[in-house]
Amino acid sequence: MKLTCMMIVAVMFLTASIFITADNSRNGIENLPRMRRHEMKKPKASKLNKRVCIADDMPCGFGLFGGPLCCSGWCLFVCL
């Protein structure tokens, strides 16, 4: 009996928290497809797509310390 009451209270609490934290912006769902189309026309480069590398003939550290690697992928004290 106690377990059933606890389950009912937990479900009510979770349901209330979902409604409280829900987005209350007006026409938020209706504007979503329009925003997606706009984003596809002008995609923003993410940090994962950006390539940070060291140019040729510049000193490199073999990538041991988490720094940028050579653009060519070859390092022998200088980028090759």
UniProtKB/Swiss-Prot annotation:
Propeptide intervals in chain numbering: 23-51
Gene Ontology CC: one annotated term: extracellular region
Disulphides: 53-71, 60-75, 70-79
Keyword terms of this UniProt record: Calcium channel impairing toxin, Cleavage on pair of basic residues, Disulfide bond, Ion channel impairing toxin, Knottin, Neurotoxin, Presynaptic neurotoxin, Secreted, Signal, Toxin, Voltage-gated calcium channel impairing toxin
Compartments, record wording: Secreted
Tissues expressing the protein: Expressed by the venom duct.
Keyword Amino-acid biosynthesis attached: no
A molecular function (GO) term: toxin activity
Protein name as annotated: Omega-conotoxin-like 2/7
Organism the protein comes from: Conus imperialis
